[in-house]
Amino acid sequence: MGRQFICSIYLPYTINFHLDELEGNHESHPAITHQEKVTQTHRDSVKIDDILTRLSISKSESGQATPVLTPQLEGMNDYFSLGPSKRTGGSMTPGLGAMSPIPGSGRSSPLYTQPRSRATSPSRVRQADRFAAPGIGAGALPIRRKRRDSLAKSVALFESARWSVERGVVGNSGLFHAVDAAVRDHGLQNPLWVGLLGMPTESLSEKTKNAISGALLVKHQSLVVYTSDSNFEGHYNHYCRKILWPSLHYQHNEIFSFFHEESNWDDYVAVNRAFADALIKNYKTGDTIWVNDYHLLLVPNMVRERIPSAIIGLFIHVSFPSSEVFRCFARRKELLQGMLGSNLIGFQTEEYKRHFLQSCSRVLYAESTFDRILLDDRYIDVYAHPIGADPVLVDKWLENPETLEVKEVLEKRYANLNIFVGCDKMDPIRGIREKLLAFEQFLYDNPEYQKNTILIQTSTFTEEQKEYGVAISDIVTRINSAFGDFSLDHLPVTILSSDLSYPQYLALLSVADAFIVTSLREGMSLTCHEFILTQRQKKSPLIVSEFIGCASMFSNGAFIVNPWSTLELSLSMKKALTLSTNERNQRYSNCLDVVLTHSASNWVTGFETKLKKSWTSQQKRDFSRLPRFTLNFIGNRYDHAKKRLLILNFDGNAVTWEGRHEFVDFHYGYMVSILSKLIADDRNIVYIASCLEEDELESLFMHVPGVGLIAENGCYVLPHYAENVHQSWIRLYKKQQMDWREPLHDIIQYYSERTPGSSLIDHGFAMEFNYVKAENRENGLRSAGELASSINETQHGCRAVPLDGRVLCEPTTISKATAANYIMTHLIKNPEELDLILVAGNNRTDESVFAWANKSKVSSFTVSMGVGNTEAKAYTDGIPSFFNVLNSLCA
């Protein structure tokens, strides 16, 4: 059984160096960076340590590992911050840095002794090189010499130190938990993690790196990826955090884009290349590769270029914006092309999936369907499959002694109070400001709740969001000043500014009377799932922003609100506190069903199953793997068949709207003679399928009397003579199936007028936007992408197909397959006697009839005469080769 390579920017594990054991080294571990800064909010709110002291909540002394909280998809670690003063507190051993706690992770972060980053700011260096006058930078040589000396000392220091593997404190904890759950439930047999260590590694010697890699591979099934500190600084802290993250969440920052997007693109590519190289080196036939999230969007195509047959899946955990936002990325094409190296791409919601398909259509001009991107040589499946929490893990920790103890104390401390709870990192995207403003409005509008209702919000403050933290502080101060009673020690808003342990976090969720998540945009928010699992007894309601991925999942149970509407959110708070028992139970039951159904384990096994199914299906359509259509391939079964149906199409190579005479000059006589031989055999029923109109097609095949014809890609059928049906054209569509034509004509005309040199061509059954002769090719491509996206999003009954130099708009309810099915059910006498079907074609319009024949109960042969991804089960090298086989069959 093959291995499952699970790629995430960080491994679930990291390394702790025990430098305090070295002789002469008496330094203690460095202080935590984020604890140096204290904002005004701390003075207006009660710190978690103060609360725990006041409530006599003891911390667990057990040695049991505490899992990482799932609310935080990734840690915004600052261990690569440049200023030494920001890295350390007090004296430090040279070359050391502190692993910063995860801002907003919601748990205590163990402090590991690890190397300090050797990175210089890539963006600053490159911007200086870009705009500086000659000679600038010469004075840096002494600094570089000192840096080399310091690096040498650090390498020697860490090489002599003992180290241990520890559970990491940064990374996609939701993914980590999900994989652990799938392994526990036997849904995943042989996972192998691929990622970074979550710490700077330039100060480590090759010997140390190899030892660490070996230990993690053997004991922890983890493949370590190494990259330079500078590359990671540019990749993660600049390109990912300041370019991709904000824009993916509809917070595009033009200033950051100007300074970081192009300057840090090479770093993003370099880190992705390091992952791809590790995968390529270790991949074996039968293995699967599962790439996770926006940090590694280029990896799928990098691997595909080296291993064309690899099984590659990609899952995007964050939200995916509309095409209007995504096209703002300077490297939008490269990002999408990197993603399209996958066999399967997964998203949290149908909305994100639709946005991705639209982006591919508008940016890459790729043909797309509801759940698929069609490329020339293959296709990519796209689907929505939301991640979930692990009920088994949560239930286990709910029974933990510390959880029960904290819960008991909280219940006593806040008895007779209504408790709203929120858990978010301090980030404008999380909507803490909107939540506080709505709570303030709630207290103003409902005086009866002013003295008996509180909001407890956990939020870790970071230097990165200092200004936002000050704004939050102002609102908290205003609310507590207006509605607080300091004589009674009553504060309506409590900001817990330090991380909670996992038991404390679960205890807080379990005592909540309502849980409020008001993110302005978020991929999923697993805090909602965990809240539901903690409420089996109390059954408190959930208030969720409509802009979170889980909103659609909990639509039948939670209060779905617009966080921008202060009034709507305020009213939802009151409704949550005044629910009847029956409604409360029903809402909770609906939410619990969702959480249990969409569990973490089911998510992992579902993705793995879908990935393998997609790869298998795509392999069957791989043109290079198809058998050649020869006399030996079909001859025996053809000879023994008593009744045969042949549907042949030569449009793609032989007949086009502009090149029909080429077909006539080179193949016409040969084709007519072979078709005449086929029709002369009473066992054969022969149809020619084409995109041509009735008169053109009938004129072209006038020298083959009795042949059946399918015109305009299935809109009309002229029966084969042997069916004893009057040979007149039969229309296979109803007039209402063409209602899309009139409005579509105006849309295409609009794009044609704004694209000089382009034209609208009406083919009867279809319409075409042709920009082959457009004065500006780029303008034509842009118009084509917008047109295809607009039609596929808004028009019913038709779909736009981007082709080379044109966009073909065709009906969705009419095809060669519908015509073939009509022939089978209405025109062929005694269809049950049919024992062989042969379908051959050479362009994309034949794929539907290939699929139809493949699903038929009758023995079928489907043959592609073109090159590319196809539903056909065999191929030939063009029309002449196919004619030669037919000629041999007639002999």
Swiss-Prot record:
Q: Belongs to which family? A: In the N-terminal section; belongs to the glycosyltransferase 20 family.
EC number in record: 2.4.1.15
InterPro entries cross-referenced by the UniProt entry = Glyco_trans_20, HAD-like_sf, HAD_sf, Trehalose_PPase
Q: Where is this region: Glycosyltransferase?
A: 132-613
- A cellular component term, taken from the record's GO annotations: cytosol
Q: Where Phosphoserine occurs, residue numbers?
A: S108, S109
List the molecular function annotations (GO) for this entry.
Answer: alpha,alpha-trehalose-phosphate synthase (UDP-forming) activity
The UniProt annotation puts the region (Disordered) at 88-126
Q: Which GO terms describe its biological process?
A: trehalose biosynthetic process
Q: What is the protein name stated in its UniProt record?
A: Putative alpha,alpha-trehalose-phosphate synthase [UDP-forming] 100 kDa subunit
Statement: the UniProt record of this protein carries the keyword Lyase: no
The protein's enzyme class: transferase
| Gene3D superfamilies assigned | Glycogen Phosphorylase B (3.40.50.2000), HAD superfamily/HAD-like (3.40.50.1000), Trehalose-6-phosphate phosphatase related protein, domain 2 (3.30.70.1020)
A Pfam match is: Trehalose_PPase
Ordered alphabetically, the record's keywords are: Glycosyltransferase, Phosphoprotein, Transferase
Which stretches does UniProt call biased (Polar residues)?
106-124
Judging by the UniProt lineage, the source's domain of life is Eukaryota
Chaperone as a keyword of this entry, yes or no, is: no
